[in-house]
Regions:
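Terminal targeting signals and extreme-terminal segments of soluble enzymes
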Residues: 1-133
Length: 133
C-alpha cells in the first residue's frame, strides 16, 4: 500500500521525533518511532509525551484522510493517555483505530506497544473536524 504523498515524509515536529508511517487509512493508522536518547526522560524511560505525540499525529492524519475531499481539516481536541508499562528502548509501535465518525468530531483509540508487542499505553483521542483554512 502506498501512502498519500502528504504523509510519505514527516514534517515539522513529526520529523523532529522520527515518526514513520506504516499504514494510513481513514479507519486505521500504524506508525513507529525508533527510540533514541533524545526520547528519554531523566530516569531512562521513554518520555510519555512521545506516546501522546505519536497518537495525536496519526489520529489527526487518519481523520484528515477521511474528510479532506469534503474541504475539511482535522486536529486534536482531546488527548487522554494511560501509561501501562515503561518502555526503555527499541521501537515504539502505534496502532490507531477509528471508533466513531461524526460530523464535527472523530474518536480514535491507539495502542502503544513495544518490540515484544506488549501494551505500554492506551490513548483515546478526540479529533475536531473543521472547515479547512
Amino acid at each position: 500500500m502506498s501512502l498519500p504523498s502528504e504523509l510519505q515524509r514527516p514534517v515539522g515536529f513529526d520529523r523532529l521525533y522520527g515518526l514513520e508511517i506504516d499504514l494510513a487509512t481513514p479507519e486505521e493508522m500504524r506508525a513507529r518511532v525508533q527510540v533514541t536518547d533524545d526520547h528519554l526522560q531523566p530516569f531512562g524511560l521513554v518520555h510519555g509525551g512521545l506516546f501522546a505525540s505519536i497518537a495525536e499525529s496519526i489520529t489527526s492524519m487518519g481523520s484528515w484522510l477521511g474528510v479532506r475531499d469534503e474541504g475539511k481539516s482535522a486536529q486534536g481536541l482531546s488527548n487522554q493517555t494511560s501509561f501501562l508499562r515503561p518502555l526503555l528502548g527499541g521501537t515504539v509501535h502505534a496502532t490507531a483505530r477509528r471508533r466513531h465518525r461524526g460530523r464535527t468530531t472523530q474518536v480514535w483509540e491507539v495502542d502503544i506497544t513495544d518490540d515484544q508487542d506488549r501494551l505500554c499505553a492506551l490513548v483515546r483521542m478526540t479529533i475536531a473536524v473543521r472547515d479547512a483554512p
